[in-house]
Amino acid sequence: MQKEKITILLTVLVDVLGFGIVIPILPFYVTSFGASAFTVTLLFSSFALFAFVSSPFLGALSDKIGRRPVLVFSIASTAIGWFVFAAADSIVLLFIGRIIDGAAAGNFTVAQSALVDISTDEKDRAANLGLIGASFGIGFMLGPLIGGVLSTVSHSFPFWVAGGLASVNVLLTSLNVRETNTRRDRSMLLSINPLAPLARAAMNAELRPFFLNWILFGISFMSVQTIFALFVQEAFGFGSFATGLLFSAMGVFTAFNQGFLLKHVWLKHFSEAVLEYAMTIVLCISLILMALSILPLFFLAIILIASAQSNLRAVITSRVAGLAPPHMKGEILGIMSSLMAASMVIAPVVAGALFEIKSVLPFVLGIVLMGLSAILEHRSLRRAAEKKGP
């Protein structure tokens, strides 16, 4: 089981490394085509829109035919998408490249489902999902640093490298990842309508609060992430290399938090519910510090936001996976990805429009949404305490 876990985590790491290489460079690459900041955010949204449509279907497909074939297909599509993006000579081709990747964006969801499959209990499940976050953090630690260096060759070169890494990952996954879904339901009917699984999930009273908090978190965090490179360029004069270093620093703190602190500190001393509430407040505070545009406070906010957002991802996902029926875990986690993708559709458009009015406004939006989420979580904790009694 330990070997399976390491193999899945390595697959995630290679995938995120490719993404980490290009994410700080992407706004500068797109603007070299003469695109506006709003067009940059629309590119993020195009990926997310198609991920919103495909994620529940791919998750359900992995419940039906297994995790491994869906994972291989998804990573192969990522490679094709990055190659199209790198070879683009027009804004239209840039959109096509992101759409291809978005339409098959099931790799992260399926990897999560595979780790949930081999988890032994609630604590192990949250810790395993935290390790995925740690892999994500390492990818974002190394990727932007590599991307910053590669961008000195040309703005398109990092995207060729990302496509090459995804191609290697297809081979790695095909040869080393074995099937973890022992409860495949080949008789289940699949629907390509993305609203069908969302409607089913919305009927589940236990899951609804988690879905709402997930959307609020998604819109808040993605609004800031989308305009991050543009904001630090305006506020502090940072270019692509310095922006890559900031993303790398965030990756260091995310990896340390998810790989060590989550299991050995946070989950050891706090319940998942309390940890979710606390990290929501920390995320809100970090956005306030960023909005002040004071460099030392901004660096502090990088540490706080890396810890808070990574804990929230792991804890909310773990709680939802624990409530999902065994034969529907892939679909439910796919719905989580779909909701995050919906946030990625909404957030970049709104953030881009707000940024063009005043650069600090996307942070204000995030503060308001996370404040609302904290209020909802506080009420949930209070109801749980009242139900438990003295």
Protein language model features and the residues they cover:
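Helix-breaking motifs and short loop linkers at transmembrane-helix boundaries and internal kinks
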Residues: G34, G66, A87-V92, L292-I294
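Cytoplasmic helix-loop-helix junction between adjacent transmembrane helices
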Residues: G97-I138
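Juxtamembrane intracellular "pre-TM" segments in multi-pass secondary transporters
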Residues: R178-L212
